């Protein structure tokens, strides 16, 4: 069992490197806005109790006696049917073949444990065991988007979807799990119109740039507008070559999200 645990640690580190490489687009310009806070949006978000609409996602892979967990991703709940919750995320977060999906919420206790011999800690097995199994219901044919479902007894919020795409200079807030900062919130503005992103990573998307700070672990997280409606899903960001400097984030806007949901609603696989 000890050898399995070591393989798990190695798999986590390798997964981190793999996901990080997806973010590096090689573009210049530093717009690190991690200390920006829009107090009015923060207050509206808290009043609407929307933090619990956001989730985190891990992949779990079992190979013989070894169990490994992939790097964290993010998502947001957009619908509910009883105890079944439906969430949007980035397709690349849930694309690992042969893996199980695990979802955690704001109420999941994220216990950690140290790795002997090195200054590094990972989530404990108790934390993973407390997460909810999830399934992929649909992967978009157009963008880095996916719909997943999980069942939970707890009461979680559902976010509404905006009617229109955000415009350049619109203020947004992003929610995700960057670098194991669970359910972190950042603020910024939309900085471009629609562009094509992600083609070199195999997950092309019609998306917009923004200045709200995101990092590894933010993939699939929510971008929220001033009216507290979902205006986009964040599939990634442009970072410096060493991964330490944020340049800009990317969001897939609601026009693309609605197309994804229309495709899903019309697909034979929808239950």
Task: Describe the function of each predicted region.
Residues 42-44, 76-77, 135-137, 150-182:
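Active-site substrate-binding loop(s) of clan PA
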Residues 23-26:
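C-terminal motif of bacterial Sec signal peptides marking the signal peptidase cleavage site
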Residues 38-41, 58-90, 132, 185, ...:
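A conserved glycine-rich beta-strand in the N-terminal activation segment of trypsin-fold
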Residues 31-33, 37-44, 106, 110-121, ...:
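C-terminal cap/linker of serine protease catalytic domains
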Residues 2-13:
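Bacterial N-terminal signal peptides that target proteins for export
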Residues 80-141, 247:
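Catalytic-histidine neighborhood of serine endopeptidases
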Residues 51, 55-65, 151-157, 184-264:
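Active-site region of chymotrypsin-like
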């Amino acid at each position: 069992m000890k050898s399995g645990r070591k393989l798990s640690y190695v798999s986590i580190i390798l997964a981190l490197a793999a996901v990080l490489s997806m973010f590096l687009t090689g573009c210049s310009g530093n717009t690190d806005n991690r200390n920006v806070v829009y107090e009015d949006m923060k207050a509206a978000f808290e009043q609407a109790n929307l933090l619990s609409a956001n989730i985190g996602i891990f992949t779990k892979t079992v190979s013989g006696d070894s169990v490994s967990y992939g790097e964290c991703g993010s998502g947001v709940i957009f619908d509910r049917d009883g105890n079944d919750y439906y969430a949007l995320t980035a397709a690349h977060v849930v694309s690992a073949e042969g893996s199980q999906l695990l979802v955690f919420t704001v109420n999941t206790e994220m216990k950690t444990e140290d790795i002997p011999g090195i200054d590094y800690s990972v989530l404990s097995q108790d934390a993973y065991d407390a997460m909810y199994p999830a399934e992929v219901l649909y992967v978009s044919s157009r963008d880095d988007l996916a719909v997943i479902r999980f069942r939970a007894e707890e009461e979680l919020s559902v976010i509404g979807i905006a009617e229109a795409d955000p415009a350049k200079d619109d203020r947004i807030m992003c929610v995700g799990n960057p670098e194991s900062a669970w359910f972190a919130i950042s603020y910024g503005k939309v900085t471009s119109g629609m562009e094509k992103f992600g083609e070199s990573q195999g997950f092309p998307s019609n998306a917009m740039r923004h200045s709200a700070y995101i990092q590894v672990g933010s993939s699939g997280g929510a971008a929220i507008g001033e009216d507290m409606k979902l205006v986009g899903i964040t599939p990634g960001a442009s970072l410096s070559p060493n991964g330490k400097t944020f340049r800009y984030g990317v969001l897939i806007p609601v026009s693309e999200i609605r197309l994804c949901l229309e495709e899903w609603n019309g697909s034979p696989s929808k239950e």
